[in-house]
């Protein structure tokens, strides 16, 4: 069993973005390739959770396993993806990553995993005053809490956090690097993120 593993939530077609975000072009590759390059530099084991409509395309791009949600919970949002990844890889802690934050740095995973300890169920950053539960780390024991929520047809990350002993991190090293956590939800945000990248 690894101490740490990574779970990337690739999702599928995005109505707001107009295409699958995981496959959007970024730095000569795609969002998903860039995120995996960063994660695999820090984590030995990483799995991608993908919607069936893009799974084959993602598999051609990446060198890590690509799976779909556990059938019973298919389509139940990020909680289903996280628990599916936890079932696929055995680890003590899981670093979660959405596919629409392409600016993430390997330094972030070093900071995040450095904050984990057995007394906590989760480590979650607070960026510009907002909790970021999909850019966080969760202990293996959270798996049972997720199953309990899904059984009750609850899909909210906020509901999960309310049941966990969470260590929130909002230190200088996090706030000074808020651009690591930029989410790209629309084409406008995508254009802006590319501009910001070329200005660096």
UniProtKB/Swiss-Prot annotation:
Keywords: Cytoplasm, GTP-binding, Magnesium, Metal-binding, Molybdenum cofactor biosynthesis, Nucleotide-binding, Transferase
Cofactor field: Mg(2+)
Binding site for Mg(2+): 100
EC number: 2.7.7.77
One BP annotation, GO: Mo-molybdopterin cofactor biosynthetic process
Binding-site list for GTP: 9-11, 21, 69, 100
Signal sequence, renumbered to the chain: none
Molecular function GO terms recorded: GTP binding; metal ion binding; molybdenum cofactor guanylyltransferase activity
Database matches in InterPro entries: MobA-like_NTP_Trfase, Molybde_CF_guanTrfase, Nucleotide-diphossugar_trans
GO cellular component: a single term: cytoplasm
Identification of the protein by name: Probable molybdenum cofactor guanylyltransferase
Free-text note regarding domains: The N-terminal domain determines nucleotide recognition and specific binding, while the C-terminal domain determines the specific binding to the target protein.
Family: Belongs to the MobA family.
Reactions catalysed: Mo-molybdopterin + GTP + H(+) = Mo-molybdopterin guanine dinucleotide + diphosphate
Subcellular location: Cytoplasm
The UniProt record lists the keyword Magnesium: yes
Task of the protein: Transfers a GMP moiety from GTP to Mo-molybdopterin (Mo-MPT) cofactor (Moco or molybdenum cofactor) to form Mo-molybdopterin guanine dinucleotide (Mo-MGD) cofactor.
Domain of life: Bacteria
Main localization (coarse): cytoplasm
Organism ancestry: Bacteria, Bacillati, Bacillota, Bacilli, Bacillales
Enzyme class: transferase
Naturally occurring in which organism (per UniProt): Bacillus thuringiensis (strain Al Hakam)
């Amino acid at each position: 069993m690894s101490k740490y593993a990574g779970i990337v939530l690739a999702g599928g077609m995005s109505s707001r973005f107009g295409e699958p975000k995981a496959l959007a072009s970024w730095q000569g590759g795609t969002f998903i390739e860039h995120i995996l390059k960063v994660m695999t530099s820090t984590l030995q084991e990483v799995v991608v959770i993908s919607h069936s409509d893009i799974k084959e395309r993602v598999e051609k791009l990446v060198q890590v396993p690509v799976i779909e949600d556990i059938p019973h919970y298919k389509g139940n949002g990020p909680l289903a993806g996280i628990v599916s990844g936890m079932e696929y890889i055995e680890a003590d802690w899981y670093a979660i990553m959405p596919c629409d934050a392409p600016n993430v740095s390997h330094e972030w995973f070093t900071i995040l995993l450095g904050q984990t300890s057995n007394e906590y169920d989760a480590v979650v950053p607070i960026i510009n005053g907002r909790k970021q539960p999909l850019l966080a780390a969760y202990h293996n024991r959270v798996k049972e809490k997720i199953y309990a929520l899904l059984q009750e047809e609850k899909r909210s990350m906020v509901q999960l956090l309310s049941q966990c002993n969470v260590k929130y991190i909002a230190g200088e090293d996090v706030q000074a690097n808020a651009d690591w956590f930029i989410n790209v939800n629309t084409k406008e945000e995508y254009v802006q993120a590319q501009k910001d990248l070329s200005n660096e």
